[in-house]
Amino acid sequence: MIEPKEREMHRIAVTGIIWKKEGREYKYLITKRSPHKKAWPNLWTVPGGGMEVDDYIHGETTFANSESPQWYNAVEKTLRREIKEEVNLEVSDIQYLLDVAFIRPDGVPAIVLSFYCTYAGGEVKLDEDAVEFAWITAEQVGDYELIQGIDHEIELVEERLAAK
């Protein structure tokens, strides 16, 4: 088992399962990671990435005059930024799905907060970290080599949407 380098610090990342309804089916956006990526090259995933202090520190604060300023909605701002950077889309109705904690191969503890959100506009334009994209149904997840767990997350979203 990999031991964490720091006991109190975690790398926090967010992912967004973007969905849209086409006819009677729900479709989910997945992207194929570039072969030059160190982690999970050539595997399919959903948009997301790490939180950065700049996602919130220059934004509107609550209790700005205190010794310890606070920023609300930092995770949502990160998710919107990552989706815009990676696939050039706008999203709405962001909903929490689940979280996953693990220790990366480099020893850094990580937490991924996974959300699902409605496609709200734009045309997919990939950044340099992805080489392909597809809008797929939950039934098609087995046709793609996805990063472990993404298939399960898409199935969970499908269940939640079907229950509406």
Language-model features, listed with the residues they occupy:
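Acidic, metal-coordinating catalytic segment for phosphate/diphosphate chemistry
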Residues: 1-23, 33-37
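NUDIX/MutT-family hydrolases
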Residues: 114-116, 125-157
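Active-site-adjacent beta-strand/loop module that shapes the phosphate/pyrophosphate-binding cleft
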Residues: 11, 90-93, 100-123
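Conserved Nudix-box catalytic region and its N-terminal flanking loop in Nudix hydrolases
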Residues: 25-81
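Short alpha-helical functional segments enriched in proximate histidine and acidic residues
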Residues: 82, 86-90
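Short loop segments at secondary-structure junctions
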Residues: 20-24, 34-35, 118-123, 138-140
